[in-house]
Structure formats: structure tokens, C-alpha cells
């Protein structure tokens, strides 16, 4: 039985297309040590009395291969549904090298969100922590509060309103160069380029094509290594991501040094971007962020600010092509806004507040294909939840996949229906694409800005048809159509760029 399970694990690894060296390591490890670890795992499970039901899977990798495999097959809910049907809404597993309790209900979401720094703290697996180091995603307690206060000063609506025109101008330029006048485009790679360029400009004023190109090449390797099995061997995604992260930090370090000189000489403005803001401001104790902290947090925001938004925009284009009545309503709303502007006048913050239906469309896309699948916490003390013991030091995981497509919370959950966000909207803690509580994504307003400005500019210039109707969407690590969503562009009679 153990031999068969080892072979099954190897087959799952091959399905994930990891390098051959990784297969060899897995095979050697499981053939030589499978039975020994099987006994240890059984003993360990019995030692923790009262924990939620479930299984730890294999040592080191646990059930990570199946977890990732379901995502890459386009069925991330399968991992959770199969276990909730067997164990209930709270179950035990092992993900990315850690014993983990998974919470699969709105009540579980509320519990974790409301007990931050009381019973739990934000705690990604060590593999993620090693990539993002001293960033907001890895810090806890007072350090996290300090970082969040500093970053939110730049990312709050009052600050972002000053960048709406800048985003609008860049969006028009991007569409004119890469979309308008084309018969057919592949949306995902273009949207990745768009959101990455936008994030680089707003966060660090990186707009030189050579600098952008180098950073882009490293970044594409980096994003593939986030949320991977933490095996640091040559050829694995995780190992490649670590090297890419170091290269990105080196490039950011050079940019930081140049910016310091520019600020001292008066050639750069403290308000021009996030980098200048971080270099020019101090916390409550009068201390500035270190260069390493700045590098780590800009790396985090580049990741969160471009990969998540490009994913959402891509599936949004897919849904609008599949639902022409929704497209027409978005077009009507956006043309009303465009008609209220003077010729050449850029969008302003107040215009975004008028895009109510457009944002409901974006919310529905986020419900069906949320960019972030969930997040980890760690128990800072032993506690009881729903009659089960959660040991101190254990990881916990909440997931959008436990509520976003469940008929208990959303009628006809597989149907694209923006009207479900009218009025009071969904029940509390059922729609959580940005998380919740003190650890809610600090960039949610920036994401809203990116999405609405792009949507405004694309719909008023063209509509589009899917080249591959029914194209499958997989999650690796963000939702993405398997062919990148090729679309045929149909320009309007009047072009508004």
C-alpha cells in the first residue's frame, strides 16, 4: 500500500511538470523512507488528541501536490469539497511542509479575521517567507502594524486619487500601442505587461524599457515559485524563484541608491511614487525603513499589484464577451462618464465613484475567479474552535473556495450575475477576494483603480469576441485561461483614445 501511494505521489508530481531532478528526489525519498515515515505520521496523529479530522499525507510535501494539482487542472474547489464532504467544514491536512487546519465556512472566515493578534497571526509557509523576507506579508505584531501604517498612507484613497490621471494616461498609451488597430490579440500577456508597467511606474517610477525588460524577465520566474513545495534544489520552481528574487532586489537596490541621490539634489519629488514616499517618511518613532525593507515591500507590491490585477482583468474580459448584455450596460455607463468630460480631459477619482455597475461586474468576476485563493494564519496559543483543539504553532488556512461558489450563499453560483452585488450584497464573510480584518489586502483600492480605468478605456473603444469559446481557466498560481484568452477586437465606429 505504501509503495502504491509513493508511486501515486510521483505521478502527481509529473502532472505538475516539475523538473526531472525533483522526480528523482521524490522517488528515492519515498522508496527508501516511505514505511518509516508512515509509522511516524500515524504516531504523530494519535499524539494530538482532539484535533480536527483529516490526514497529513506524506512528510515534507503532505497533500501539497494534490492541492496544487487541483488548481492547475482548473478545479481548486475539488481539494476542499472532497474533504469537507468527508470531515466537515474544519479539517486537518499538511500544506507546503506544515500541519494545517483548513476553515471552510463564513463562520470560520469571521473567526480568523476577528482574532488576528489575539489567537492567530498572519503566517505564510516558510517557502513564501523566504521569498518575501521582511515584507508586510511576513511580519506580525507591532512590526506588521508599523509597515501597514506606512504603506497605507500611500495606498489609501485620499492618496491614490492623485494618481488617477496618471493611470488613465498610461492606459490610453498602452491601448494605442498594443490593442487599437489590431484584429486579434492575446489578452493575458498584454494585461500582464500593462499592470506590471503600471505598478513599476507608480511604485518606483521605473519606465525605462531596458530596466523594465530586465525586471520583467526575473519577475516571470519569481511568480512561478510562490506557493510551491519548498525544495531548494537546482531546477525546481522554488529554487529559481529565490535566485530571481535576489536579482530583483539587486536591481531595486541600484534604483534606491539613485533615488536617494535624486532626492538630496532636488531632482526627485517625495510624492512622485511609493519609493520616494518610503525614503522621505518616518514612522512614529522617527525611524525610516531600511533599504532591505523597502526592497522587500516593493517586491511584494509589484507581485500583488500586477499579477492579481492582470488575472482579474483577463477573466473580466472573458465574462463580458460571454455576457453581451453586461457588456452593453458597462458601455452605457462608461460612455456617460466619457460624455461628461472635456476633450482630452483625464479621468478623476470622482469618475470612478460613478462606475457602480462596472464595479459590480468586476466583483462578480472576483467571486468566480478570485486572484488570491486564500491565506495562512498561525496559532499563537492553543485554543478550541468548533469543539476541536488547534495546537499552538499550527498553521490555519482560509479559502475563497469554501464560499464563493456555494449555493448556500449565492443563488445559481455558476451563473455570471453582477446584480447579486446590488443593495446589501452577499452575506458577511462569504465574498472575501481581498481577505478581511486587520490583514485585509492593503492594495484593494489600487486594484479597483487599475481595473476600472482599464475597463473604461477598453469598452469605449471596442468590443471583443472569444477565439476559443469555453476556454478553460486554471490556477497557477493565479486564475488564467489556458491559452491566454485570444480575442478578436471589433472597434466601434468612433475611437476615443
From Swiss-Prot:
Recorded superkingdom: Eukaryota
UniProt topology in membrane: Single-pass membrane protein
Record's keyword annotation contains Zinc: no
Gene3D superfamilies per UniProt: Cytochrome P450
Location(s), subcellular: Membrane
One GO term (biological process): sterol metabolic process
Matching SUPFAM superfamilies: Cytochrome P450
Transmembrane segments: 20-40
Protein name (Swiss-Prot/TrEMBL): Cytochrome P450 716B2
Enzyme Commission identifier(s): 1.14.-.-
One protein family per Pfam: p450
Family: Belongs to the cytochrome P450 family.
